[in-house]
Amino acid sequence: MQNERRIAQRFLEDKQLPYSSNELITMALTHPSYAQEKNTVANNQRLEFLGDAVLNLVVAEYLYNHYGRKAEGELTKIRAKVVCEDALAIFARNINLGQYLLLGRGEEMSGGRKRKSILADAVEAVIGAIYLDQGLETVQRFIIRQLEELISETASGDYYDYKSKLQELVQARDKENVSYAIIEESGPAHAKVFVAGVYYREQLLATGEGKSKKEAEQKAAQKVLQDNLVPGT
């Protein structure tokens, strides 16, 4: 149990999250396969259940407060896109959640750290843990910090997830992943410009520029798709 607690502690410190105890985060990072293998009761499924409800509440309240002119039906569609499995898997990747997960050997060997369903479930479990440990205000900041840009893009109708589409195409061919890195950053603090590169097996496929790291990565993935640079095509 000591090793599990150390991993949870590292996650909390790396993400600069306040906490009173790391017990809940340890549970949030524990996939059922690990709990079964180690013969422990605590896994992240109950926290996932709670986190799902908290996530929907936080996003719904944010939409209600920031998009007063949109009708109920529009708000429901926006929320659905923002809290779907694909969006939550991106959330998880943006905070490198996969590297902290406690997985059973079978899940580990089959690529569970990169599996969308596992990542999305773990995000919800972490949200549930933060809510129980620190309350609604803290978990609101954690969620909105990661989803605000996606909410804005989705609400404006401009959002298309090029990164997920590219990843799906690559994995369908050879089960590999593409990766992203910021290769240039310029401009003053209030008007930064980022250049991101998208890589496959350490080879640069394309670059993209944006006002945020996420936008630059999306632009890089978009260029790969539009210029037909997908590996294996």
UniProtKB/Swiss-Prot annotation:
EC primary class: hydrolase
Biological processes, Gene Ontology terms: mRNA processing; regulation of gene expression; rRNA processing; tRNA processing
Pfam families: dsrm, Ribonucleas_3_3
Residues binding Mg(2+): 48, 121, 124
Keyword Lipoprotein: no
Domain of life of the native organism: Bacteria
E.C. designation(s): 3.1.26.3
Entry GO terms, CC: cytoplasm
Catalysed transformations (reactions): Endonucleolytic cleavage to 5'-phosphomonoester
Alphabetized InterPro entries for the sequence: dsRBD_dom, RNase_III, RNase_III_dom, RNase_III_sf
One GO molecular-function entry: ribonuclease III activity
Active site: 52, 124
Domain RNase III: start-end pairs: 8-135
Listed cofactors: Mg(2+)
Quaternary context: Homodimer.
Similarity-based family: Belongs to the ribonuclease III family.
Described function: Digests double-stranded RNA. Involved in the processing of primary rRNA transcript to yield the immediate precursors to the large and small rRNAs (23S and 16S). Processes some mRNAs, and tRNAs when they are encoded in the rRNA operon. Processes pre-crRNA and tracrRNA of type II CRISPR loci if present in the organism.
Protein known as: Ribonuclease 3
Organism: Syntrophomonas wolfei subsp. wolfei (strain DSM 2245B / Goettingen)
